[in-house]
Amino acid sequence: MITLRCVVERITYQNPGNGYTVLRAAVRNYKELVTVVGNLLDVNVGSVLLLQGDWKVEPKYGNQFCAEKWEETMPATVYGIEKYLGSGLIRGVGPKFAGRIVRTFGTDTLTVIEEETDRLLLVPGIGEKRVQMIRDSWERQKEIKNVMLFLQDHGVSTSFAAKIYRQYGNESLDKMKENPFQMADDIWGIGFKTADGIAQKLGFAKEAYVRLRSGIMYTLSNLADEGHVFAYQEQLIAKAAELLEAEESSIVMTLDQMIADKDLICETVDYKTDQAEMKAIYLPAFYYAEAGVAGKLKRLAQAPAADRLWHALVDARQQTGNESLSIDVSKIQEKVHMEYDEIQADAIRKAAVSKVMVLTGGPGTGKTTTTQGIIAAYRSFGLKILLAAPTGRAAKRMTEATGLEAKTIHRLLECKPPEGYQKNEDNPLDGDVLIIDECSMIDMILMNALLKAIPEGMRLILVGDIDQLPSVGAGNVLRDIIDSGVFPVVRLTRIFRQAQSSRIIMNAHAINEGKFPDISNGKNTDFFYIEKEDPEEAVQEIVRLVKNNLPRYYKTPWNHIQVLTPMQKGIVGAANLNLALQEALNPQGDGLRR
């Protein structure tokens, strides 16, 4: 590892989130400025740095010094001190005041700021208020640098220093030494493994309660990232014991204490095997979200609708004595100029008499055209209809298909970070019906927020394909609603003629039915199978398809094409494919760091 002493002349780029910095610095005996990269959060123009790292040649950017460790030393010359102070480092001191201060105190300037701040009143134009600003800012910088040194000494990226200081202020070092695992709870981006690395260097016992507690929380969070709302107790104990290298008996004792402290919630649930009941362990946020979703759906289904269609059907049923009476679908078909099969017609009739209903089916089975019929039925009675979907693209497709405005769920709920959703139980949505498309993409937390904003007199129609990939967040909400058997569900199964011309759709259904897809290649098809044994050849083929063949054949610009790969690393992984595609499609563009 090489040691390099330099003076920062220019900061080219700095990511305040992770601290990654690109800067230009002056180094003695180097004629030109050198490029330095690394986690150099909170350095400033004029900073004198002692770096440890190695030189690396980047094809695009040339020779760079990659700093792995660094510490800041104070500038010793009048010029260096003036540049350092005037860089924006100290609140209340710009280039003008930096010059005045240095002219007054010379090389003693930093000592005066550190030990005799009141002497700054001798500088023309500096009063009590500015002196206090300088004092506070100087102390803040010192604390952040102390946090950085602590993290560096414990092998942790210094990019967390500013986040830690923002959370704990002047108590940062004490907090980290007292319980480094608290950072995993309090600071986004700092996880159990980072905190555990610090704790081990500080001498924390492997079976310390704070360590076991943090490891259990980390295990549950990882399971949530995989889509699970809870973990069965036996599964959680085994996974946590493996992670923590601890006895299962210690995990059980810690788990019991966490449940007693309400850090976690334990619920007895039915299990699908011969075992009648199992204990499920929840993070509180997921428990209350799941309970909220179940409770609100039940209340919605039981409460009468407040709209004209509902009351018209209630009156008609009372007059005729026919409790299964619904609307006349033939009139709806005339309105939308469409002929529905019996299952689609049943969906429209069920939607007319239901408070909560699910419409599901695979691609090409007519979910969109059926939704159009449901909307036409509601509109014929003057109902106010709200449309929404989880993503902007899905909302746009919904608007194009129905002619009505559809919003993303976040926009519908008027999400305003950091305050949250403006639409909620105290400020509910205004309408008679809410129809949500692509519901398989909605996770438990979002569904709970959505349902909170629905008044109990409103109808809810959920549309989606349960065989699509589930939501990114925890919870398989649409499938769970269907499997509950509590709410009316209409499954569309017929693949319509227009969809039968799509091999993608036909193969999707084949796979879903456990059949091998048709991988033969031919003209006028939207599905091709190209086999490449060599990974490098596969990358070249993907680049050729995206750059030339697909845009030309389908009249689609390359930036409307998405490449999916099941892996992050490797020659055909996402990281390498992104580089290859950027080089071919956007060679002059700036790379994006994750």
Task: Tell me what each language-model feature is.
Residues 345-348, 353-522:
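ASCE P-loop NTPase helicase motor core
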Residues 21-33, 413, 573-587:
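Short, basic/aromatic beta-hairpin or loop at an interaction surface
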